[in-house]
Amino acid sequence: MNMLALVAPVLGIVALLFAYSLSAKVSKQDAGTDRMKEIAAFIHEGAQAFLVAEYKILIVFVAVLFVGVGFGISWLTAVAFLLGALFSTVAGYCGMNVATKANVRTAAAAKDSGMNKALSIAFSGGAVMGMCVVGLGLLGCGIVWLVTGDSNVLSGFSLGASSIALFARVGGGIYTKAADVGADLVGKVETGIPEDDPRNPATIADNVGDNVGDVAGMGADLFESYVGSIVSAITLGAVTYSITGAVFPLLLAAVGIAAAIIGTFFVKGDENASPHKALKTGTYVSSAVVIVASLVMSRVFFGNFKAAFAIIFGLVVGVLIGIITEVYTSGDYRFVKKIALQSETGSATTVISGLAVGMHSTAVPVLLISVGIIGAYMADGLYGIALAAVGMLSTTGITVAVDAYGPIADNAGGIAEMSGLPRSVRNITDRLDAVGNTTAAMGKGFAIGSAALTALALFVSYAEAVKLFDTGIDLLNYKVIVGLFIGGMLPFFFSALTMDSVSKAAYKMIEEVRRQFRTIPGILEGTGKPDYTSCVAISTQAALHEMLVPGVLAVIAPMGVGILLGTAALGGLLAGSLVTGVLMALFMSNAGGAWDNAKKYIEEGNHGGKGSEAHRAAVVGDTVGDPFKDTSGPSINILIKLMTVVALVFAPVFLLVNAGMGLL
C-alpha cells in the first residue's frame, strides 16, 4: 500500500513540468513596445528586489526555528521543516517571476489580438503559480512520508510552509497597500489624476505590490493550507485506518492535480462572452473530476463511500463560499450597489455601509462551514473532517491560477495606461481586471473557508497528540478559560499590528508623493519624470521592518501558553483564535472587496461617475478597505493555521512540562 504513495511525488513532478511548459508559452509571447518593456522591467525588478530582501531576513528566522525544532523535537523533523520553508519560497518566487512577465504580454495581446489571447496569457501566468503550489506541496509531502513514514516528521514540513506563508502574506500585504493607499489618496483624491497614471510616483510601487502581495503572498497562503490539510489527514488517517488512511489523502491530492490540469484546458475565452464564465468553467470541471474520482477511490480503498461523502462536503462548501463571496463583493449584486448609493452622501456613510456589509457577510459562510463539519463528521468521523479540508483544497492548482490571474490582469491595465496605449486596449484590460477583482474576492473567501477546515483538522491532530480526547477540554477549568480569551484576542491584536503597519507606511508614501509633486518641475504636466525608485524603496523598507513582530507573535503565543498553562489551555487558545479569526477574516476581506467594487461600479458611470462627489467618497471607502482585504484579513488565515501547527509540532515539549499541566 505504501508504494502507492509514490504516485504523489510523481504527480507533483508532472505539475511542475506543466508549470514549466506554461511558463515557456508565456515567455514566447510578444512583450509589446519599448515603453511597455521599460515599465514591465521596473515592475519586475522591484518585485525581485523585495523578495530577495525578504528572503534574506527569513533565512535568520528559519535558522533559529530550525535549531529550536532540532534540539526540542528531532533533527529529522527540523530537516522536514527546512524543506517545507524552501519549497514554499521556491513556489512563491517562481510564480511571481512568471506573473511579472505575463502582465506586459497580456497588455500586448490586448493591443494586437484582443480579449481571447489576453485572457489566455493572463490565466497561463496565474496557472504557473497554481501548479508550483500543488506540485511542490505534494512532492514535499510525498518525499517526507515515503522516507520517514512518520506523521510527526511530516508536521515539520507543514511548519516550514506556515512560517514562510505568514511573512509572505504580511510583508506582501503591507508593501502593496502602502503603495496603493498612497497612490490613491494623493493621485485620485488630491490631484484628480486617474489610476495608474505615469505621473504618479507611487504607481510602479503599486503594481509591484500586486505581485508580491496578491501572487507570491496568496500562493504561500494556499500552499500552507494545502500542505496542512494533507498532513492532518495523514495524521488522523494513520490512527483511524492505519496505512490505508494515511496514503489515501496523498492519492486524493494527486488526483486533484490531474483534475486541475484538465480544468485549465477548459478555460477558453470568447471575444463577446464574459471571461468570468471561462474561468468558472475550468474550476467546475476540475471539481467534477475530483468528485467522480473520490467516489471510485473511496469504494476501492475502504469498501464504502464514507470518505467520498466527506470529500464532497468539503468541495461543495468551498464552491458555495466562493459564490456567496461574489454575492457580497460583486457590483452585479445589491450589497455593493447599496454602498455605491450611500457614497452620494459622503465618505462616512460609505464606510458605515461597507462595515455593515462585511459583518453581514460572515453569517452564510460560517453556516456553510458548520454544515460541512457536521456532514464530514457524520460521514467518516474526525478523519472525515480532515478529508473535507483535503477535498476543498484538492483543486488548489486551478483555484490559485484563477486567483493569480487577477493581479496579472490588473498589472496589464496599469502598463497599458502608463504606456499611453489606445482606449480600446484599456477597455479590454478593464474587462479582464473587473473579472480579476471578483475572482480575487472569491479566492479570499475560499482561502478563509479552507483555512478554517485546515486549522480545525490540525487542531484535532493536536488534540490526538496530547491526548485531549481522553480528558476533554473542561470549559470550567480556569486555565482553559484564560486560553480561550487569549486566543479570541489574538486575531484582533494581530490585525491591529498589520493595519497600523500599513498606516505608518502609507503616511511615508503620501509624504513622498506630495514632495515630488511640489519639487519636481513639470511632473503634473507630463514633462517632468517622477522618481519611482524612492517609492519602491519606501514600501520595501516598511514591509520588511513591520512584518517581524506579527510573525514572531504567531510562534511565541502558542509556545508561551503551552509551557505556562499546559496543553488544555493551549487547546482553548487554538479554539478561541479559530472562531474569532475566521469571523474577522471574512468580515475584513468581504468589506474590503465590497468597497473596492462599489468604487468601480461608480467609475462605470453610475451615481455621477469618475470625479463626482460619490466617486471621491467611494475612493475613501476603497482606501479603508485596502488593508482590510489585502493585508489583515488574509493574514489572519495564516495566523490561525500557524499557531495550530506550532502546537502540533511542539506537543511533545508541552507534555514534558509538568505532565502537560504547565508551569503555573
Tell me the role of every PLM-derived stretch:
Residues 1-664:
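Hydrophobic packing and interface segments
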